[in-house]
Every structure is written in C-alpha cells, then in structure tokens.
From Swiss-Prot:
It is found in: Cytoplasm. It catalyses: GTP + H2O = GDP + phosphate + H(+). Residues 174-176 are annotated as: G5. GTP binds at residues 19-26, 81-85, 136-139. It comes from Clostridium tetani (strain Massachusetts / E88). HAMAP family: EF_Tu_B. This is Elongation factor Tu. The keyword Translocase does not apply. Mg(2+) binds at T26.
C-alpha cells in the first residue's frame, strides 16, 4: 500500500493529557486513537505502545514522552502523553512538547489528587490556557451525586489557579470501557463528546508567521560600503525589506533601524518568515551598536526586562546537573535565546534550599535587561553546563 501524503488541509493543534498517576491518562489516549481509528481518522495505538514511551533528550534533560496523532472532522491533532510525573514537569517547563491546550484526566472514583493540583498549576505557569476535563472511571461510581461533587472540586481547583473553571467543558465517562468496546456506541459516546469539546473549546493557535516579527541575533558582520548585517533564525513573524525594527536587550534603550536588505543562502529575499535563517542588513547601525544576545523585533512588540519570576526544573546529577543543592542568592548564568546573562535568585518564603531534581518558583534579578515575554524559555548554566531549565511566568520589571 502506498504511503499517504500528509494533508495540511485541516488546522493543526498540539494537545496533551495531564493529571494524577493512575487516573487513566494513557488509557484515554489509547481510547481516543482507537475510536477515531474506527471512524477512519487515526491509526489506533494500544495502551502498551503509548506506555513504553521512548526517552528523548531535550536540552540535556532526559524526558519520556509518547506522541500520537489523530484527526477529528475539523482538525489534525498531535497529542503527547507522559508515563511519569517527573516527565510532565520536565516536559512542560522545557517546552519539549508544546501544548496549545490540555485534557485533564481525573478519576471520578478518587477525585482530585496532589498531581492533579500540580499539573493545573504547571499548566497555568507555562501558558497552557485551555483545559478540557475528562472525569474517568465513571463506571466505578454508582452514585451520581459523587460524580457531581468531584466535578465541583475540579472546577474549584481550576478557578484557584486562574482558569475559568466554571466554563470549562467537563465530560464524564470510562476510557477503559470505550477502549474495550470500540463498536459500542454507548461506550464510545464519551470519547466523541470529549473530542467535540476539545474541537470547540481549545482555539486554533495563532501561527508563528502571524505574530509580530522577532529574530534573536546570533552573529554580526560588516559589509564594506553596505553596512552592518545581523544573522539569526527568525523566531516568529515576517520581515520585509523596508520594515522598521528595534534592536532590543542588553541595554536600557532600544535602538530603531530600517531593514535595507535580507539574504538567505547568499540569495536576496523580499521577505523572510518564521523558521528562516537569514542575514538582515541594518541602516545606520554601527558594528559596535549591536551584539549577540539582542533581538531584532517589530517596533514596540517586545520590551527589555531584568526581573521576573520563573518556574524552574533543576537537573539531577544523572542529567549532568549539580551534585549539591543551591541556596538563596545563588548567581548562575541565565541563557536566553542566544546569550548568557548573570542573575541572582530569590527563593520562595520558607524554602531554604533547592535540591537537584526539584522544581520551584523563583524570583530572578538579571544584571542587564533582556528582551522577554511571559512564556519565554531559558536555561540556567554554570561554567557552560546546563544545571536547570525554566520558563518566565511573570515579568516584574
């Protein structure tokens, strides 16, 4: 049979299953692929195929993740499922598996558990804005009032972490029953209802090319008689010759310039877009007025900041991280996009020290300003080796 071509006719959305261990995340993932597979929208994956997730290395951190894909009438989905709790923490903080939205799986028999809370908190910190709830194992609960109680608890928990808990769709069912009886419409209805809720409630993400232009500067050189060229990979947006941009970061003032030429693979371009590796010729900018670690950005779209709160995962010794804990006032380098900037950290009240393998909210004060938005990822480095990975959850100055 000839291989099918990947059709990009439907909008693409990245989602994932989150929730407490043994509440049925992997069973649900298997059920979704199996039931959509029966309708011709997916390749069915068995529980074991999803559960034995391959280990991946992302920024030196070992993460086990399973990726499956499937379609509904309206969309194409890439879906991630992690076997272990630590894998979720690492995945969400490093952004290894991007999620535009999530399916929170809660066992109706047990109600919200510690990791339920932790995953909701993490989702709010790393910018996952839309959560659809699946109350699983409903076949184990005889009393409808108990299910209503669990639903109320989950909605309250979501409200507590800034999600619209009262508006979030909640679907009740049994992933196992659906998986075991894919032909039985009554058993599979909960999966169809869940996917309908995901289709409707999780918005199609804005494409990278629709966002304001931004390119981290990797290198700078001078072309005699033409001016200064900054090279790098366009992170988002589109850049056209004649566009006005700002050079942001590593100083308090941003400098404006106009793009007088764009080159890619030694060919001249009229416009560059997200993903392109380019050289941009800048009008009126001297070689010493721009440096690696700054960004070129659409005017007014990004500001330089020096203090922020970050959600951080600290690498374990086995991952090449520190062998010892660190304390308040620790001063490592923070690696943003293309450069290291020294900063000092303040730990939350009541936290004396941070051990390798922990994840923690910390306040960071950098010695110089860096172009940043909430949701920007960074690495924490010490003498050139990565000891932590983080995401900016709130900018304070």
């Amino acid at each position: 049979m000839a291989k099918e071509k990947f059709e990009r006719s439907k909008p693409h959305v990245n989602i994932g299953t989150i929730g407490h261990v043994d509440h049925g995340k992997t069973t649900l993932t298997a059920a979704i692929t199996t039931i959509l597979g029966h309708k011709g929208f997916a390749k069915a994956f068995k529980y074991d195929e999803i559960d034995k997730a391959p280990e991946e290395k992302e920024r030196g951190i070992t993460i086990s993740t399973s990726h499956v894909e499937y379609e509904t009438e309206n969309r194409h989905y890439a879906h991630v499922d992690c076997p272990g709790h630590a894998d979720y923490v690492k995945n969400m903080i490093t952004g290894a598996a991007q999620m535009d939205g999530a399916i929170l799986v809660v066992s109706a028999a047990d109600g919200p558990m510690p990791q339920t809370r932790e995953h909701i908190l993490l989702a709010s910190r790393v910018g996952v804005e839309h959560i659809v709830v699946f109350l699983n194992k409903a076949d184990q609960v005889d009393d409808a009032e108990l299910i209503e109680l669990v639903e109320m608890e989950v909605r309250e928990l979501m409200n507590e972490y800034g999600f619209p808990g009262d508006d979030a769709p909640v679907v009740v069912g049994s992933a196992l029953k659906a998986l075991e009886n894919p032909e039985d419409d009554a058993a599979t209805q909960c999966i169809m209802d869940l996917m309908a809720a995901v289709d409707e409630y999780i918005p199609t993400p804005e494409r990278a090319t629709d966002k304001p232009f931004l390119m981290p500067v990797e290198d700078i050189f001078t072309i005699t008689g033409r001016g200064t060229v900054a090279t790098g990979r366009v992170e988002r947006g589109i850049l056209k010759v004649g566009d006005e941009i700002e050079i942001v970061g590593l100083s308090d003032e941003s400098k404006k310039s106009v793009i007088t030429g764009i080159e890619m693979f030694r060919k001249l371009l009229d416009e560059a877009q997200a993903g392109d590796n380019i050289g941009a010729l800048l009008r009126g900018v001297q070689r010493d007025e721009i440096q690696r670690g700054q960004v070129l950005a659409a005017t007014g779209s990004v500001k330089p900041h020096k203090s922020f709160t970050g959600q951080v995962y600290v690498l374990k010794k086995e991952e090449g991280g520190r062998h010892t804990p660190f304390f308040n006032g620790y001063r490592p380098q923070f690696y943003f996009r293309t450069t290291d900037v020294t900063g000092s950290i303040a730990l939350p009240e009541g936290v004396e020290m941070v051990m390798p393998g922990d994840h923690i909210d910390m306040k960071v004060e950098l010695i110089t300003r860096v172009a940043m938005d909430e949701g920007l990822r960074f690495a924490i480095r010490e003498g050139g080796r990565t000891v932590g990975s983080g995401v900016v959850s709130e900018i304070t100055e």
